[in-house]
């Protein structure tokens, strides 16, 4: 099974056609939608299903100009690093020896290693957080999470914050490692995310199960 197989199947379903119709209608009204059309499915482009080792769930894309490009928590290289990603880097620096904090927030090199950076809602209207949360994307991304759980073994799922943690019911914990904490946003990072040790625990599990690990330093 590949992403193309999953996408081809889902695109035939009424809910998916409704999503595409909604986006086309909103664009026709002159509304700005992020990420741009060609970047909406970048998480699937950069992390092949066969190579997938880790899933990090976000909620919806960044809603300001030049930020969102289809990967959860990631921004274009020339954009300021968002606060949540700054806290992700802080946890990496705290827990990973010799981690070098990048001067950018472009996470494509994680994605290419098998870190699937999936927002549960794939689009957003400019400057309106969560504006597309009810248009059907979660039906699609819930299916994706479930397909990963059913068709892969020994994947590490990082669920940060209450929204992501609700997706735990879609994952078979007997086949995969589920790591949970508060969200890395400034509002909640100090209530459990900073100090969670997820990146260390992730690599311990991957080494044990697959004799592989993620090079979190590869961004530098």
Curated annotation (Swiss-Prot):
Q: List the disulfide bonds.
A: none
What is the top-level taxon of the source organism? Bacteria
Q: Does the keyword DNA repair apply?
A: yes
Task: Tell me a Gene Ontology molecular-function term this record carries.
Answer: uracil DNA N-glycosylase activity
- Note the Gene3D superfamilies from the entry: Uracil-DNA glycosylase-like domain
For this UniProt record, the keywords arranged alphabetically read as follows: Cytoplasm, DNA damage, DNA repair, Hydrolase
Give a GO cellular-component term: cytoplasm
Q: Which family does it belong to?
A: Belongs to the uracil-DNA glycosylase (UDG) superfamily. UNG family.
Q: Which HAMAP family match?
A: UDG
Protein's job: Excises uracil residues from the DNA which can arise as a result of misincorporation of dUMP residues by DNA polymerase or due to deamination of cytosine.
What NCBIfam families does this protein map onto? PRK05254.1-1 (NF003588), PRK05254.1-2 (NF003589), PRK05254.1-4 (NF003591), PRK05254.1-5 (NF003592), ung (TIGR00628)
Name of the protein in question: Uracil-DNA glycosylase
**Which organism does this record belong to?**
Francisella tularensis subsp. holarctica (strain LVS)
Starting at the broadest rank, the lineage of the source organism is: Bacteria, Pseudomonadati, Pseudomonadota, Gammaproteobacteria, Thiotrichales
